[in-house]
């Protein structure tokens, strides 16, 4: 069981938090939007309303105690960038950040992200491989260059 912080409870963040819980992990979900936090209360271990671009708020979360921090903010790149940097500044051991474009990924990596995820792109590629070919039922991506079909 891992302890995970999920920042941003839009579609991606909410699904990520729910799946992490389903897999037996503890999840603290954070969003600046009170309605999103209230909607997630039954899905996660704990949920808080807060601005993750605020240093005092990040410090209060004890981010160094989480195994994984997921920055799932998709609609505000500046907030995503600041949150990623603050998480690393306050001791987060591993930060997975969402990017919508390659230029976003470049800045997120420079500011502390350990891994970048492109949810829409990655799912589109996976579905194109699965449904665009008659003989492939599923595949596992081992690295960006190698997959098992």
Describe the function of each predicted region.
Residues 1-149:
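Cytosolic regulatory regions of ion transport systems
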